Every structure is written in structure tokens, then in C-alpha cells.
């Protein structure tokens, strides 16, 4: 294995249609996820740095903290360049792409939400309220349901990706990372403070 390329995390947000920004902005990459076809890599930026971003989030926060929102970036893996950015919430952490390549899901730690981005429309189409500190996300292979860990609480959120309605699974304190078994029959969760 060898290093093929290094992609700088700085972007000109204005060139992507965000006219209130000028100049280059540096991100702070956290986690990534591939598109199902392997053409793209999406990564979350904990924060953005540059003119207009003045209040970087922290791990102890709430929506009332007033921290800056951030962006999800997309790398075109044929050129190793950032070719798209999407506005998300404050302190985005986990990103997952649905297996049918319909949605990109981002957990926003300080906003207490999950951003739903339509791949076809290339924009955020829904912001789903979760509760304190949304973290891990997994999606069933048929792209019917997403599960989100509410790390600041004691439950998982099951989101119907057709309607965006939620049901809840009580699980115990501080669920963090989630993994689905290959047959989608068992959902595993790490408990941060258990």
C-alpha cells in the first residue's frame, strides 16, 4: 500500500454557490463514507475556519450554544478533488450513505439533528430532531431504515427513510457506535459510559 494523493480540506465556498462567503475556508475532517459505487468519498468537518466562522463548536454543547454550522465535503475519487459541499449542522460527526445511493445522512452533534441530503437533488431535504448528541448511524441493506445513536441519552432512533418518521429503542446510557450484522438481523451498539 502506498500514498496516492493528499486532498487539502480547504474550499472556496462561494464557488459552490454559498455567496455570503469569500476566499478559501479550511475544514476539520472527522469521519468519512464512500458512495455505494465507489466514485465519491464524503467527509464531515467538525468546524470550518475562515471569515464568517467565529464560534467553533465543542463536544459540550446544545443548539442554544450558538456555535457555527459546518459543511459536508465530497471528494471525486477520479481526480482527488473536492467537487461538492453541503451545509449541515453544528459539529457534524458521522456520515453514512444509504445503499441505494438516495440519501446521505449526517449526525450533527451540537444541533441535536440528522441532516438528510438527497443525492439526486444535491441538497439537504430534511433535518430530523434526535436529542442530545446524535452519533453513530447505520442503514439497513434495503435502505428502508436508518438507526441513529443518541449518545447523550439512552435510546436508538429508528428512522423510516420513506416517511422520516421515528420510533425508539431503549438501550441504556450513552450509545455511541452502531454496527449491523451482515444479514441485518442484529444491531450492535457500543455504550460509552456503561
Say what each PLM segment does.
Residues 1-194:
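Predominantly soluble domains enriched in secretory-pathway, periplasmic, or organellar proteins
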Amino acid at each position: 500500500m502506498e500514498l496516492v494523493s493528499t486532498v487539502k480540506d480547504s474550499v472556496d465556498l462561494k464557488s459552490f454557490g454559498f455567496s455570503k462567503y469569500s476566499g478559501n475556508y479550511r475544514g476539520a475532517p472527522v469521519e468519512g463514507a464512500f458512495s455505494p459505487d465507489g466514485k465519491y468519498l464524503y467527509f464531515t468537518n467538525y468546524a470550518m475556519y475562515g471569515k464568517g466562522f467565529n464560534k467553533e463548536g465543542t463536544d459540550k454543547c446544545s443548539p442554544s450554544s450558538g456555535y457555527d454550522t459546518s459543511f459536508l465535503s465530497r471528494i471525486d475519487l477520479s481526480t482527488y478533488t473536492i467537487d461538492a459541499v453541503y451545509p449541515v449542522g453544528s459539529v457534524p460527526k458521522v456520515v453514512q450513505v444509504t445503499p441505494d445511493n438516495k440519501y446521505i445522512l449526517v449526525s450533527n452533534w451540537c444541533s441535536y439533528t440528522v441532516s438528510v441530503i438527497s443525492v439526486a437533488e444535491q441538497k439537504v431535504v430534511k433535518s430530523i430532531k434526535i436529542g442530545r448528541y446524535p452519533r453513530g448511524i447505520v442503514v439497513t441493506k434495503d435502505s428502508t431504515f436508518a438507526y441513529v445513536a443518541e449518545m447523550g441519552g439512552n435510546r436508538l432512533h429508528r428512522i423510516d427513510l420513506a416517511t422520516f418518521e421515528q420510533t425508539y429503542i431503549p438501550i441504556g446510557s450513552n450509545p455511541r457506535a452502531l454496527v449491523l450484522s451482515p444479514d441485518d438481523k442484529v444491531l450492535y451498539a457500543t455504550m460509552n459510559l456503561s
